Regions:
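Segments of small-molecule ligand-sensing domains
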Residues: 295-369
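Hinge/beta->alpha junction and helix N-cap segments in small-molecule ligand-binding domains
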Residues: 65-71, 113-115, 129-136, 159-171, ...
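Signal peptide-proximal N-terminal region
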Residues: 30, 37-63
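Extracytoplasmic ligand/sensor domains, especially the bilobed periplasmic-binding protein
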Residues: 87-174, 253-255
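Short, well-structured alpha-helical segments in soluble
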Residues: 70-84, 198-207
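Extracellular/periplasmic periplasmic-binding protein-like sensory domains
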Residues: 229-305
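Periplasmic-binding protein-like
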Residues: 21, 81-92, 109-113, 154-161, ...
């Protein structure tokens, strides 16, 4: 969705945009790989964005698409000297080559795929579309501290399962340090194995509301605590109190009973992506994808078709306004973009982060974009 639309067709000057996409489409292979199938969905989503943008603005769009697996990568790269921006592939080595070329020729390069790519640090014009882990942790911790600093804040409780993988121990340690600095008291509840309602009620009076902090993002660990937390939430609700359970980006992938329990336990987690499957823009875009390509986009996190759509719609909106980077946040169907330049970094990085919060009884979570 063009939530940041400026001029309309009636008063917009016609602009010319030259965009290159370099994707592993495997057009010469007898059988498509999973990577090429996802790249094709991305490409198809991007084409839908071009179509939608073209219906709103009279700009001229020259889109060049290169298959990075066809053996002509070096020659294709050398032909990009006059494009406005390059969308880079899911390939570390090729991104490095593209970065050297685009940095030398002052061409923005848009990384839609590799979360941990760091070429933006040392290369001008590189655009890393994924918020970095350090910044993501900092923003999530800021949000938790702000929540727990309110006058009527719930009491924080850290769950410490002796048999937990504790894959988020680093995050929890940082959060505890911050809570200590802010003078926010918290309780640590130790247990071993499955977390039962009785363990919670024996240690936490139901006369208060609680903010539970977990130490793992894994589904297997979540399954050890979800049922007990859901039952405990009912006990709290009977006395007019609430339960919030803080979790992690992996929780966005939960399906079935695990997903159903997110609302029951008052789940709150952060993520680089979020799709409102019942949203009008989502349904419209998925329907258009089906109409044009005869099938639904492949499911995944992120959905590659929507990633392609959001990437291209952002790029076209920015180029329409005269730059590769917008001077304000942009909220798409699945991704949000708010590129920033930080000291010591030659390129730019997306600073947007979703906070997803489930409330018991609500049909869908509330979403905040930081």
């Amino acid at each position: 969705p063009d939530t940041n639309a400026g001029e309309t067709c009636d008063n917009a000057a016609i602009r010319h945009h030259r965009i290159a996409m370099m994707l592993p489409l495997c057009t010469t292979a007898e059988k498509a790989s999973r990577q090429s199938a996802l790249a094709t969905d991305f490409y198809r989503g991007a084409l839908l964005a071009v179509k939608d943008f073209g219906e709103a603005y009279p700009d001229s769009i020259d889109l060049k698409v290169y298959d990075t697996t066809d053996g002509n990568f070096s020659n294709n790269l050398a032909s990009l000297h006059n494009v406005d921006i390059v969308i880079t592939p899911d390939d570390d080595a090729k991104i490095a080559q593209i970065a050297r070329y685009t940095g030398t020729h002052s061409i923005p390069a848009f990384n839609s795929f590799i979360v941990k790519d760091s070429t933006y640090i040392t290369t001008p014009y590189m655009m890393q579309t994924y918020i970095g882990q350090e910044r993501m942790y900092a923003k999530a911790i800021d949000y938790v501290v702000e929540t727990l600093s309110a006058t009527d804040a719930p009491k924080p409780v850290i769950l410490d399962n002796a048999n937990d993988r504790k894959d988020k121990l680093n995050f929890v340690s940082r959060l505890k340090e911050r809570l200590d600095r802010e003078g926010i008291e918290y309780t640590t509840l130790e247990f071993d194995g499955n977390l039962h309602k009785t363990i919670l009620e024996d240690n936490l009076p139901t006369s208060a509301s609680y903010f539970i902090i977990t130490m793992s993002g894994h589904l297997s660990e979540y399954n050890k605590i979800a049922s007990g937390l859901a039952a405990f939430a009912e006990s709290l609700a009977a006395e007019g109190n609430t339960l919030t359970t803080f979790g992690y980006p992996e929780w966005i992938s939960f399906r079935g009973d695990a997903q159903d329990k997110l609302a029951q336990i008052g789940a709150l987690y952060y993520s680089r992506f979020y799709v409102d499957k019942d949203g009008e823009d989502t349904k419209r875009t998925i329907a258009e994808f089906r109409r044009w390509y005869g099938k639904a986009p492949a499911d995944g996190i992120p959905v590659q078709a929507l990633l392609g759509y959001d990437s291209m719609r952002y790029i076209l909106t920015a180029l329409h306004e005269g730059n590769a980077i917008l001077d304000r946040p942009y909220h798409g169907i699945q991704s949000s973009y708010n590129f920033v330049h930080t000291p010591g970094i030659k390129g730019s990085i997306n600073d947007a982060l979703y906070i997803i919060r489930y409330i018991a009884g609500a049909t869908s979570p509330s979403v905040t974009i930081l």
